[in-house]
Regions:
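Cleavable N-terminal export/targeting peptides
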Residues: 1-28
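Short loop/turn motifs that connect adjacent beta-strands in outer-membrane beta-barrel proteins
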Residues: 23-30, 66-75, 111-128, 156-165, ...
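Short glycine/proline- and aromatic-enriched beta-strand/turn motifs that initiate or cap beta-hairpins
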Residues: 25-77
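Transmembrane beta-strands of outer-membrane beta-barrel pores
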Residues: 37-41, 80-84, 131-139, 169-175, ...
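Residues on the lipid-exposed face of transmembrane beta-strands in outer-membrane beta-barrel proteins
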Residues: 63-67, 105-113, 151-157, 191-197, ...
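Surface-exposed loop and membrane-interface regions of Gram-negative outer-membrane beta-barrel proteins
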Residues: 77-142, 224-228, 269, 274
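Outer-membrane beta-barrel transmembrane domain signature
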Residues: 172-249, 291
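Outer-membrane beta-barrel "beta-signal"
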Residues: 277-291
C-alpha cells in the first residue's frame, strides 16, 4: 500500500471518527460527497521546455462536513486528488498519474455565544476565534508531507448565508523525500474570506474562499518564498429540487480556482525557480450529494 493510500485510509478514518460525535452533538450538520474535474491544473516546476506550464487534468473526490454546535461551528474536508500522466507518480515520465490526499480541519468558536454578550456591530453579527490544521501527502517527485497549524480571529458578517473574514497565523512544515528531516518555515500570516450565499429565491448558491498568504521565508532548499493568492469558488444549482427530490441534496455546477505562487513557489523562470507552473487558472465541473 503506497503512502497516499495509507494516508487516505488514515485521514478517512479520522474524518469518520471526527464527524460522528460532531453530528451527534450538533445543532445542525451537513455532510457532502463531491466530485470535481478540470484539465487546466498546474504544479510548480512542471513546465514545458519553453517555460510555459504543463496543463494537468485532475479528478478530485471530496468528503466534507460542516457542523454547528452551541458555541460555534466546525469544518472538515478531505480531498482525494488523482492527476493524469502529465503529473506522474514519483515524478517519472510514463508512470501513472500522481495521487494526493489533502485534509483540512477548522473550528470557529463564537465569542458572543461563549460569553453570552452580544458582539454585533453594524454589518458584523459576531466575533470568533478560528483554529485548526492542514495536512497532506502526495506521491509525485517532491513527495510532500505538509503539516500546518492555524489560529486567528474571525469576523462573521450579516449576510443571507454566511461570510467570514479571518486573519490567521500559519505554522507550517514539510518533509519531502529530498531532505533528511522535517523543515519548518517561518511563521506567516494569511487573510481569508469564506462564504456560502444563496442567490435570492433561485435554486442557486455561490460558495468559496479567498486567501492572501504572506511569504514564509526560505524554503527547504534555501530559495526565498513568495506571497501566495488562492481563490476557489463555485456556483451550484439545486438540481435535485428541480427534479422533485429533496432540496439541497443533489447539486451540480461550475467551479473556478485561481492559484498564484502555489505553496509559496514564485512564478518566475530561471535556475531553481518554479516557472509558470506555480500559477494556475482552472475551470471545473462539480457534482455534490448531501446527506
Amino acid at each position: 500500500m503506497n503512502t497516499p493510500t495509507r494516508t487516505a485510509v488514515a485521514i478517512g478514518a479520522f474524518a469518520s471518527l471526527a464527524i460522528t460525535p460532531l453530528v451527534q452533538a450538533a445543532d445542525w450538520s451537513d455532510t457532502a460527497l463531491s466530485v470535481r474535474y478540470g484539465t487546466q491544473f498546474a504544479e510548480p516546476y512542471d513546465n514545458h521546455a519553453d517555460g510555459s506550464r504543463v496543463d494537468i487534468a485532475k479528478t478530485i473526490v471530496a468528503l466534507t462536513n460542516v457542523t454547528g454546535y452551541k458555541y460555534g461551528s466546525t469544518f472538515i474536508n478531505v480531498d482525494f486528488l488523482q492527476s493524469d500522466g502529465k503529473d506522474p507518480g514519483g515524478g517519472v515520465a510514463g508512470h501513472p498519474g500522481a495521487q494526493e490526499v489533502y485534509g483540512v480541519f477548522r473550528t470557529t468558536v463564537d465569542l458572543g455565544k461563549v460569553t453570552g454578550a452580544s458582539l454585533k456591530m453594524g454589518p458584523i453579527r459576531g466575533v470568533g476565534v478560528t483554529a485548526g490544521f492542514d495536512l497532506n501527502t502526495k506521491n509525485d517527485g517532491y513527495a510532500s508531507k505538509k503539516r500546518m497549524a492555524v489560529v486567528g480571529p474571525t469576523l462573521m458578517l450579516e449576510v443571507p448565508g454566511f461570510l467570514n473574514l479571518s486573519a490567521l497565523l500559519f505554522d507550517e512544515s514539510n518533509a519531502p523525500q529530498a531532505i533528511a528531516r522535517r523543515y519548518h518555515y517561518k511563521n506567516h500570516a494569511a487573510f481569508e474570506a469564506d462564504w456560502g450565499i444563496g442567490i435570492g429565491e433561485l435554486p442557486l448558491s455561490f460558495n468559496g474562499y479567498a486567501q492572501w498568504i504572506t511569504a514564509k521565508g526560505e524554503d527547504e532548499f534555501g530559495a526565498q518564498t513568495a506571497p501566495e493568492s488562492h481563490i476557489d469558488m463555485d456556483l451550484m444549482l439545486d438540481a435535485g429540487s428541480l427534479a422533485g427530490l429533496s432540496k439541497k441534496t443533489w447539486l451540480v455546477g461550475v467551479e473556478y480556482e485561481y492559484w498564484h505562487n502555489k505553496f509559496g513557489n514564485k512564478t518566475a523562470t530561471g535556475p531553481f525557480l518554479a516557472g509558470d507552473g506555480a500559477t494556475a487558472s482552472t475551470p471545473m465541473v462539480r457534482v455534490e450529494y448531501h446527506f
